[in-house]
UniProtKB/Swiss-Prot annotation:
Family membership noted in the UniProt record: Belongs to the OMP decarboxylase family. Type 1 subfamily.
Coiled-coil blocks: none
Described function: Catalyzes the decarboxylation of orotidine 5'-monophosphate (OMP) to uridine 5'-monophosphate (UMP).
One cellular component term from this protein's GO annotations in UniProt: cytosol
Gene3D superfamilies: Aldolase class I (3.20.20.70)
Superkingdom per UniProt: Bacteria
HAMAP family: OMPdecase_type1_B
The protein's name in its UniProt record: Orotidine 5'-phosphate decarboxylase
Species name: Idiomarina loihiensis (strain ATCC BAA-735 / DSM 15497 / L2-TR)
Gene Ontology molecular function, alphabetical: orotidine-5'-phosphate decarboxylase activity
Pfam families: OMPdecase (PF00215)
Residues of the active site: 62
Length: 231
């Protein structure tokens, strides 16, 4: 079954808040992105329950450690039943390859996606930590590393989507945060794009948070966004 194009960022701090939000979302039409905040608060059992209820889950924990540890971490994620799991490309080829190999034991492994440059980071932020490349140059460099390591795709900003599809091919998956409908505030994301423009640019899976989670009616907000991209 094809994965949903939209993953709702569940940036909640409690199970009650998460349950309330998920109850307003259509399983099968949107997926759930579970990040460090929620996963640390309520753990894998809650995530597994959402999978059992029909939701596709993107486990956004951005693993970055020694190869053996990351391999075990993605294995644990796959056992929960998530559809997408990610690692930091800056962990290097050996780490990414170890994660890829660890997932070969599963009949239906999750997509293994690499994080390139966080969408909150500007060129000056990269320069501050010793990276002289622009954000776009660094994204491409890390994306190529991820592809060479056998990963399924990368997390990137929508602005880099056309470049990555052109250089790495259409089968290399792009997962993109910083998606905001035209009438939404940009928040703390510095590189944003509308859902329609993101799809046109080649984005495969969009992560959308506040425009849905802080909407007066999350159900209606989801329906409006799905309509805007022809879903």
């Amino acid at each position: 079954m094809a994965l949903p194009k939209i993953y709702v960022a569940l940036d909640c701090q409690t199970q009650e808040a998460a349950d309330n939000l998920v109850s307003q979302l259509p399983a099968g039409k949107v997926g759930l992105k579970v990040g460090k905040e929620l996963f640390t608060a309520i753990g894998p059992d809650w995530v597994k329950k959402q999978v059992e209820q029909g939701f596709s889950v993107f486990l956004d924990l951005k693993f970055h450690d020694i190869p053996n540890t990351v391999a075990k971490a993605v294995t644990s994620a796959a056992k929960i039943g998530v559809d997408i799991v990610n690692v930091h490309a800056s962990g290097g080829t050996e780490m990414m390859s170890a994660a890829r190999d660890a997932l070969k034991q599963f009949d239906k492994p999750p997509l293994l996606i690499a994080v390139t440059v966080l969408t909150s980071m500007s060129d000056s932020d990269l320069n501050e930590i010793g990276i002289q490349a622009t954000a776009e140059q660094q994204v491409l460099k890390l994306a190529k590393l991820a592809q060479q390591a056998g990963l399924n795709g990368v997390v990137c900003s929508a602005q880099e989507a056309r470049m990555l599809k052109h250089d790495l091919g259409t089968s290399f998956k792009l997962v993109t945060p910083g998606i905001r409908p035209a009438n939404s505030a940009t928040g703390d994301q510095k590189r944003v794009m509308t859902p329609e423009a993101a799809i046109e640019a080649g984005v495969d899976y969009m992560v959308i948070g506040r425009p849905i989670t802080q909407a007066a009616d999350p159900t209606a907000s989801v329906a409006e966004i799905l309509t805007s991209i022809g879903e």
